[in-house]
């Protein structure tokens, strides 16, 4: 409520002192009880250009900072779009949790812990096809591409995921033919040995594809 200035700085220092106490407790647990802890500290949002408010769409309002005690992070941690969504998959990978496939396909983030095969999944519509592309971090193995023609998951049901392609990770993408069945939305998930990415590809139901249009 006070914007940029000494008052805000004072409370940043106070918060930093509280986090320091947590960090000292973590180091004690690791030393005295042979435990391994993952610590991630981040803000919930940014502020506007003058240091006020939240919920805006400016670069500063949308930007957060993040810090972790992980000694080794992958390239995801350095991406400009690193976000809150990356925290959950990072925790799951650190803890060794086996996330069910249907849940993993819904996760919007990527782990910044452990190896990363691909990142930055994009799509482009061309006639009745969707051209998927991704950037390669480690060019080994294959990428399995899955597609769902609905979003039953939103109603607590299972989506009908169909594997539509398998290509080398190093190809950096593939083209998926949507066939003759129209849908309002297509969901895609790309799965490699170490990474799962997803995106939604909306379609205008009032303008179905026709080779004659």
Locate each region found by the language model.
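Active-site His/acidic residue clusters
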Residues: 1-17, 53
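Histidine-centered active-site microenvironments of extracellular/periplasmic hydrolases
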Residues: 41-71, 118, 202
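Substrate-binding rim/cap in mid-to-C-terminal beta-strand-loop elements of soluble/periplasmic
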Residues: 56-98
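Polar, surface-exposed loop/tail segments
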Residues: 82, 95-129
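Conserved aromatic anchor
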Residues: 130-139
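Extracellular low-complexity, O-glycosylation-prone stalks/linkers
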Residues: 141-162
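Beta-strand-rich modules
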Residues: 176-197
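Edge beta-strands of extracellular beta-sandwich domains
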Residues: 196-213
């Amino acid at each position: 409520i006070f914007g940029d200035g000494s008052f805000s700085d004072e409370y940043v220092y106070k918060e930093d002192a509280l986090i320091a106490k947590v960090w000292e407790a973590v180091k004690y647990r690791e030393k005295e009880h042979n435990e391994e802890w993952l610590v991630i500290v981040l803000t919930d949002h940014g502020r506007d250009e003058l240091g006020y408010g939240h919920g805006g769409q400016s670069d500063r309002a949308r930007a957060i900072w993040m810090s972790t005690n992980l000694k080794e992070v992958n390239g995801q941690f350095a991406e400009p779009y690193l976000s809150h969504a990356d925290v959950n998959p990072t925790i799951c990978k650190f803890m060794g949790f086996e996330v069910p496939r249907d849940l993993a396909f819904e996760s919007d983030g990527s782990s910044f812990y452990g190896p990363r095969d691909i990142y930055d999944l994009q799509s482009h519509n061309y006639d009745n096809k969707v051209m998927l592309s991704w950037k390669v971090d480690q060019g080994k193995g294959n990428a399995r591409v899955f597609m769902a023609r609905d979003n039953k998951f939103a109603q607590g049901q299972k989506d009908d995921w169909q594997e539509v392609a398998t290509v080398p990770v190093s190809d950096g993408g593939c083209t998926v033919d949507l066939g003759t069945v129209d849908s309002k939305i297509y969901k895609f998930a790309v799965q490699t040995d170490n990474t799962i990415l997803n995106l939604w590809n909306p379609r205008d139901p009032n303008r179905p594809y026709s080779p004659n249009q």
